[in-house]
């Protein structure tokens, strides 16, 4: 018998039965518990979990509990047909079938065309890959069904244009960092190789000037610059040198680019196929299954496998498409971080130098700031990322150092060693895994009261009670108290010093600098 308790939402009066779910991993159970607690106060919640950590399984478990003991309807909305099919399969494994009528899984395109034909009102609307939810088709759901509870699931709550999600979602729940998931064995470690900063390839990418409607690089210009035989030959040489005999995914800039890559790889003995939006759904499914069975070594795609592709035995990911979008970068590399029994680590081959503008996948991200629209999910200045110490000192062979095209940025052994030692500053992380200070101390904002608190990872260490958090250094924060005075507190909120009113406090090389 699973222990259960009843939540009564103060805000809505809706009764929700919550049960401990034994089939979930510990972090999924933690996220589920936190979600139901947030639903006591808020109607609309966004949940962030890294790619490969089981968002769809968590989604299914949440929906099953939401339906427990009550006559309720749940709509699950995705932005692509493939995601709909994947979610339907997972939901069915949790004992909920579409024939029952209580759960409907659909694409946003289908729902927009057929909303008038839908029976009844949904009690819960779940948005998969919720970073797309700012589109008007999704906003219509909020307007049409204001009383329905909302849940958004995403690995990347950020937008290239810096638009926040607070118009739709009341609060954000963040999971562990990628560093902690790797340290605890839930995500795969990785090796990371990249083109060199002064390479011809990097100079070509730096020459891209045109932008598309979404603010990212223009596809037409990327194709003209990068879809050349010399460039495709370099892509192949990178795979031959660093991922020979492995199964992998390649991200291309265009349909023509993908087909040229697949043809060149196949011609040179690496069985590859190109998949894009023009590939019929039935054929696409067969090709993916052939890849799972090992009959195809490489899938070259254009925007198809950035989200929702679930194949844990992907052994390498090749980035052949430049992007200014943090979400695209993390979604793509995340395809290789899923764990499988036979995979020691994943090889990430960065042929477009993305780590220089986004950092490594293990870098700490301020999801709260991006969720609120205070920070864009875009590329940072290259000089800032290069000087941020995003690699560690590894003992490399002379052959590696002489590598003509690529340099080794990180090895999986160096990464695991850094995580074990808690030496995460060099990785852009926040602190030792598994300890009290495993992630950086950060400010957290309560939009209802307007006050600020402190959190370490997922744990709120100081409830919102400050008018401002000026600066943070290690386990100390410079704050403005509710009475207007300023001071320094530790990570538990204990005042270390209090000063008279001033305009700003900040830390400078460990010392406090007061600006009046």
Q: Model-derived features: where do they sit?
A:
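Conserved interdomain linker/interface between the two RecA-like ATPase lobes of SF2 helicase motors
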Residues: 176-249
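Conserved segment of the helicase C-terminal RecA-like domain
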Residues: 336-362
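Residue-level detector of conserved, function-critical positions
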Residues: 416-516
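Post-DEXD/H (motif II) to motif III coupling segment of the RecA-like Helicase ATP-binding lobe
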Residues: 135-190
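A short beta-strand element within the Helicase C-terminal
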Residues: 307-322, 346-349
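Conserved pre-motif I regulatory segment
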Residues: 14-45
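Conserved helicase ATPase core of P-loop NTP-dependent helicases/translocases
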Residues: 271-274, 279-301
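Conserved SF2 helicase motif VI
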Residues: 325-341
């Amino acid at each position: 018998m699973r222990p259960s308790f009843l939540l009564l939402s103060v805000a809505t009066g809706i009764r929700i039965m919550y049960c401990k779910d034994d089939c979930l991993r510990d972090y999924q159970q933690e996220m589920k518990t936190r979600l139901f607690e947030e639903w006591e106060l808020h109607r609309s919640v966004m949940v962030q979990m890294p790619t490969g950590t089981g968002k769809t399984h968590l989604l299914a478990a949440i929906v099953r509990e939401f339906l427990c003991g009550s006559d309720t309807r749940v709509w699950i909305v995705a932005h692509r047909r493939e995601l709909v099919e994947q979610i339907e399969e997972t939901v069915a494994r949790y004992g909920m079938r579409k024939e029952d009528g209580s759960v409907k899984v659909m694409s946003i395109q289908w729902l927009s065309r057929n909303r008038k034909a839908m029976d009844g009102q949904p009690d819960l609307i779940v948005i998969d890959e919720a970073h797309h939810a700012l589109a008007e088709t999704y906003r219509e759901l909020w307007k049409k069904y204001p009383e329905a509870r909302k849940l958004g699931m995403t690995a990347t709550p950020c937008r290239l244009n810096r638009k926040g999600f607070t118009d739709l979602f009341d609060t954000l729940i963040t999971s562990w960092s990628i560093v902690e998931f790797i340290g605890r064995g839930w995500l795969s470690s990785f090796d990371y190789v990249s083109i060199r900063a002064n390479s011809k390839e990097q100079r070509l990418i730096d020459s891209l000037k045109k932008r598309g409607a979404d603010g990212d690089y223009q596809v037409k210009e990327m194709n003209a610059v990068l879809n050349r035989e010399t460039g495709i030959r370099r892509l192949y040489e990178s795979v031959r040198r660093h991922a020979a005999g492995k199964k992998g995914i390649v991200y291309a800039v265009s349909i023509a680019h993908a087909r040229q890559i697949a043809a060149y790889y196949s011609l040179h003995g690496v069985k590859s196929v190109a998949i894009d939006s023009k590939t019929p759904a039935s054929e696409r499914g067969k090709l993916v299954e052939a890849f799972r069975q090992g009959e195809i070594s490489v899938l070259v795609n254009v925007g198809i496998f950035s989200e929702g592709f679930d194949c844990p035995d992907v052994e390498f990911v090749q980035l052949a498409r430049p992007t200014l979008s943090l979400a695209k970068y993390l979604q793509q590399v995340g395809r290789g971080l899923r764990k499988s029994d036979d995979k020691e680590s994943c090889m990430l081959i960065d042929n477009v130098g993305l780590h220089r503008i986004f950092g490594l996948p293990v870098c700490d991200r301020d999801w709260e700031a991006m969720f609120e629209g205070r920070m864009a999910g875009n590329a940072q200045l290259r000089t800032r990322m290069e000087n941020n110490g995003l690699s560690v000192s590894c003992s490399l062979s002379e052959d590696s150092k002489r590598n003509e095209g690529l340099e080794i940025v990180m090895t999986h052994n160096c990464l695991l060693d850094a995580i074990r030692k808690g030496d995460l500053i060099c990785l852009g992380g926040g602190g030792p895994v598994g300890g009290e200070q495993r992630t950086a101390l950060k400010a957290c904002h309560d939009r209802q009261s307007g006050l600020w608190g402190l959190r370490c990872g997922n744990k709120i260490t100081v409830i919102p009670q400050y008018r401002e958090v000026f600066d943070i250094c290690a386990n100390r924060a410079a704050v403005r108290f509710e009475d207007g005075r300023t001071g320094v507190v530790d990570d538990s909120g204990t005042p270390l010093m209090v000063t008279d009113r001033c305009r700003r406090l900040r830390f400078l090389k460990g010392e406090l600098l007061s600006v009046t």
